[in-house]
Each structure stands twice: as C-alpha cells, then as structure tokens.
Amino acid sequence: MSEDIRRGPGRPPKKRVVPNFERKGILEKPVRPQSRLEFSYDNPLIFKNLFIYFKNLKSKNILVRCTPTEITFFSRDQSQASFVIATIDGKNVNHYYASDVFWLGINRELVEKMFNSIDRSFLKITIVHRYDKPETLFFIFTDFDIDKECTYQITVSEPELDMDLIEMEKSISEERLKNYPLRWEFTSKQLKKTFSDLSNYTELVTIEKLGGDTPLHLYFQKFNSISYHEMYKSSNKINLTSTIPKSQVFQINVKIAHIKSLASAMVTDKIRILCEENGNLIFQSEMDALMLNTITLNNMI
C-alpha cells in the first residue's frame, strides 16, 4: 500500500493460521481402540457438496460401503434412471481405518441437515463407527481457531442392499473405462446451457462423432419444423478423445430430461462425460480426494 494512502479505521483483518495436516492415509490400527471405522479428513466441505448433490438429485437413502482401503457412497436419483457412486480412497486422507468390509444405511435428509450447519470455520471432519455402538455413526467437526469440537450421532442401519445399484460399479472399473469409445469435458455451465436450450424444442438429442479427427456433433431434427446442430470443432478445448475407427460412426440418442436434471444438480465446475456403445453415459467429476460418478442408462430412457 502507498504511504500517502491511509488505512481506514478499525483493526486490520486477522490472518487465519491454517494447521498443517499430514495425510497419513491408511492405518494398520485405529486411533480409538473401539473403532470399526475411522475416517479423518481436512476438507469437510467436500462432504457438504456431496450431500448437496444428493439433495439436488432428490436421492432418498444412501448406502455406505466401508472397506479396508476406501469408503464408497451409493444412491439413485429420484427418476431411478441415474446411479451415483462416490468414492474416497483411504490413502488420500489424513487417516483412514476400516476393520473389514461392511455396509451402513443412512437417511439423506438427516445427514444433509447436519452438513448444512458446517461452514469454512471447520477444518476437519472425523467419522467414527464403533463396535460397542453399531447403530450409531459419529461425525466430529473441529474448529481449530477456537478449539471447538461439534459431535453429531446419527442413527444408521444394516441396510437391504440394492444389488442393481451396486452392480453399476462394474461400469466404472478401471478396465471398463479404458474401452469407452467417446469422452469429453464440459464445464457445469456448458452442460446446463446445452441441455436446457435443447429442452425447449425436443425430448431427444443425438450425440454423434465420426472416426478420426472430426468434431463432436449434437443435434436434433423435427421434420417440417426445426433442426439444430451443435458442433465442437476444436477437440483440445473440450479434451475430446475417441477410439472410433475412421470408417465408423458413433451415434446414440439421449433423453434430454435426465441429463438436464443432472446438469442442474452438479456441484463441480468440470465434468468428464463418457459414452458407451450401448448408449450409457457416465458423468465424472473430482473434488479433492473424492471421485464422483453418475451413470445414466440408455435402456431406462
């Protein structure tokens, strides 16, 4: 600041000191002896955003699978056409421990109210499930500025597993993802605008790409009425990649209503879109240690 410009009245803002949290990853033993699950993470707002996404999709119940290496959240949207699978790898958090593979069922509305009260003053979330209280999941939020801990005890259940939902995890296996013939990236704003605009005219849109170095093409045509073509000519600007042979055409028809609702629900800025030959679509996004996948099935639209 120049010497001839005087600071206004009042004290200068106090600079916040953020603790340096070490990310130790997966532990061989829990910090608390009674813990079946311990999860400590220095980015609580990631969970808040995840449950905002579940709320936007009007998901009801959420299945939580804990394994010795990761924690995964499974749910469906209200239309039952889209399946959400969100995974956090234990090696990417401050510390993680799970004794074995087990499932918990939680009510989205109940947990959502808890996360609504969490703001940036909380720098760490700890989730604990104990052997002596199997019906309870503990959420501990820590504000280091004033040395405050807020603990919520949420009732959980041993859920009835939704096998169709769990089966969707095969769609996002590392081996399966390598074989998707078409993928590109949109910002959430681009995705929302494209499908919102299209919804004014048609229920279905065609996604098409020729083999080789050709544009991504979205279009619809109503005979004797109106047609529309949206071309993405620079593949690098949307990170467009494909494995379509030069002599072939990749083409699928997608129901706009489902994609429009997903676009409106998104909580990340960047979305990776993958198309399968049978018309299934996968929407991928990342939030720090969280990988968020939403699968929309063509045979359900």
Swiss-Prot record:
Matching SUPFAM superfamilies: DNA clamp
Presence of keyword Acetylation: no
The keyword Repressor appears for this protein: no
GO BP annotation list: symbiont-mediated suppression of host cytoplasmic pattern recognition receptor signaling pathway via inhibition of IRF3 activity
Keywords from the named record: Host-virus interaction, Inhibition of host innate immune response by virus, Inhibition of host IRF3 by virus, Inhibition of host RLR pathway by virus, Late protein, Viral immunoevasion
InterPro entries: DNA_clamp_sf
UniProt family annotation: Belongs to the asfivirus E301R family.
Organism per entry: African swine fever virus (isolate Warthog/Namibia/Wart80/1980) (ASFV)
Subunit-structure text: Interacts with host IRF3.
Domain of life of the native organism: Viruses
Protein name: Uncharacterized protein E301R
Cited function: Plays a role in the inhibition of host innate immune system by acting as a negatively regulator of type I interferon production. Mechanistically, interacts with and prevents host IRF3 nuclear localization to inhibit its transcriptional activity.
Gene induction: Expressed in the late phase of the viral replicative cycle.
